[in-house]
Amino acid sequence: MMKVLVVVALLVTLISYSSSEGIDDLEADELLSLMANEQTRKECIPKHHECTSNKHGCCRGNFFKYKCQCTTVVTQDGEQTERCFCGTLPHHKAAELVVGFGKKIFG
């Protein structure tokens, strides 16, 4: 009976050790993922900067992510080109205004 208890204790120890290494691997993967997200955040396009070549690369604002807004520009030669910039959508501006006003009133 004592041998069975020793074998069971040994198996429990081995299983817990192997699962803790698996958890460490998961934590390392999460850390790498967070570092990649931080790098992406540093490389995003700030508000009012051009996003013509990367329309999904705008940074986050206070509450919402900026959206790439495009307009058609006609040159003196008559050529039409598309120019885009990162900005806040009108309904997002309104929501930020209401939240800011609410914070001033309710503290």
UniProtKB/Swiss-Prot annotation:
Compartments it resides in: Secreted
Propeptide intervals in chain numbering: 21-41
Signal peptide feature range: 1-20
Disulfide bonds: 44-59, 51-68, 58-86, 70-84
Cellular component terms (Gene Ontology): extracellular region
Domain of life of the organism encoding this protein: Eukaryota
UniProt-recorded Gene Ontology molecular function terms: toxin activity
InterPro entries for the chain: Spider_toxin_CSTX_knottin, Spider_toxin_CSTX_Knottin_CS
Tissue specificity remark: Expressed by the venom gland.
UniProt note: domains: The presence of a 'disulfide through disulfide knot' structurally defines this protein as a knottin.
Family: Belongs to the neurotoxin 19 (CSTX) family. 04 (U1-Lctx) subfamily.
Protein name in UniProt: U1-lycotoxin-Ls1j
Organism name: Lycosa singoriensis (Wolf spider)
